[in-house]
Amino acid sequence: EAAATVMGHDLAMGTAVALTFAGDADPFDSAGVDRASSALLWTAAGLGGYFAGRWYAGVAPHNLTVGDLQTLWTGATIGAMAAGTAIASSSPNSETVATSLLAGGWLGILLTERTLVRRYDHTRSEANLVALGGVAGALMGMGVGILAAGEADRGESLTLGFATLGAVAGVAMAERYIQPDRDA
């Protein structure tokens, strides 16, 4: 429950910060929200996240381990990377970037929860190996993307697309290799 509570806080506060930047590219200029109001709202979101995280741990229809929560962060990262792929070549403004990365991160969490967390109980070390598999796959995918693009433009959609596919493949291979216990 403690790890889920902290994760709930981090997700809620991160979401509040991203929504602040999605609504205004420079939220602290003279026309935007003042710093004290933003800090108060972000703190309130974090507090709400504590309760949401505890609630999630209590009502989840499956066993929830600390490793499962770490695996959700890996899914959030891959989801955000996939969203970055969709907008990388279009010169988006900062509001679009914040909204896309936020949505991609949340979709990554939902997909990871459905495919990995509900089915398996991950230990901390297994979750670390899953994350490492994702990083290794992303690096290999970036290499393929740079070779395919013929230039070292790391911000192109093609390169990020291959990195995302590599990360997904790395996570899948790590899951296959470690063979975590089925959900109890």
Model segments located where?
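Hydrophobic alpha-helical membrane segments
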Residues: 1-184
